[in-house]
C-alpha cells in the first residue's frame, strides 16, 4: 500500500513525502535507522525530532501516490512563507482534497478502488486547522 505523509518537526517546520512503510520511514527521518531525506536529517542533527501529523491512504498505485505528493507540495507553496508551516500544509491539503484529481495527468479520485484519498489524522491540532479552513 502507498501512502503520502506529513511530518512536523519540533521546530515547527514540515515535510511531505511518500512511502510504502510509514513507521519505517519515520524512523529513517529521525535517524533511528539508515535512510531518510537530507532535509530532515539536518534537523535531527540539530537536536530536533519529527512526528507524523497525518497520512493519506487509498491510492491505487505508487505512481498515483507520487502525483498526490507532488501536488500536496505544489499547493502548499502557494501561501506566504511567513504563514505558520502547518497551516500552509493544511491549506494546500484542503485545496487538493477538493479537486477531482491531484494533477491534470492523474486519474480521477472517484475512479480509485477505495473511492478516493482518505486522510488519517495523527494530530488533533492539524485536524482542527484543516477543518477550520473553508
Protein language model features and the residues they cover:
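Residues that flank catalytic or metal-binding motifs in active/ligand-binding sites
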Residues: 1-3, 48
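Generic intrinsically disordered, low-complexity segments enriched for polar/acidic and small residues
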Residues: 2, 12, 26, 35, ...
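GIY-YIG nuclease signature motif recognition
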Residues: 3-9, 13-21, 25, 29, ...
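Alpha-helical structural elements
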Residues: 10, 24, 45, 63-65, ...
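Residue-identity detector for glycine
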Residues: 17, 35-36, 47, 58, ...
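Conserved short loop/helix modules at catalytic or binding sites
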Residues: 22-66, 71-87
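Boundary/linker segments flanking structured domains
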Residues: 69, 73-134
Amino acid at each position: 500500500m502507498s501512502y503520502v505523509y506529513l511530518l512536523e518537526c519540533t521546530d515547527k517546520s514540515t515535510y511531505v513525502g511518500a512511502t510504502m512503510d510509514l513507521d519505517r520511514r519515520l524512523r529513517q527521518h529521525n535517524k533511528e535507522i539508515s535512510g531518510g531525506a537530507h532535509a530532515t536529517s539536518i534537523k535531527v542533527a540539530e537536536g530536533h525530532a519529527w512526528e507524523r501529523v497525518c497520512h493519506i491512504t487509498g491510492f491505487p498505485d505508487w505512481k498515483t501516490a507520487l502525483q498526490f505528493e507532488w501536488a500536496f507540495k505544489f499547493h502548499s507553496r502557494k501561501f506566504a512563507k511567513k504563514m505558520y508551516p502547518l497551516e500552509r500544509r493544511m491549506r494546500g491539503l484542503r485545496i487538493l482534497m477538493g479537486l477531482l484529481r491531484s494533477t491534470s495527468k492523474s486519474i480521477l479520485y472517484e475512479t480509485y478502488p477505495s473511492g478516493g484519498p482518505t486522510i488519517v489524522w495523527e494530530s488533533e491540532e492539524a485536524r482542527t486547522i484543516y477543518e477550520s479552513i473553508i
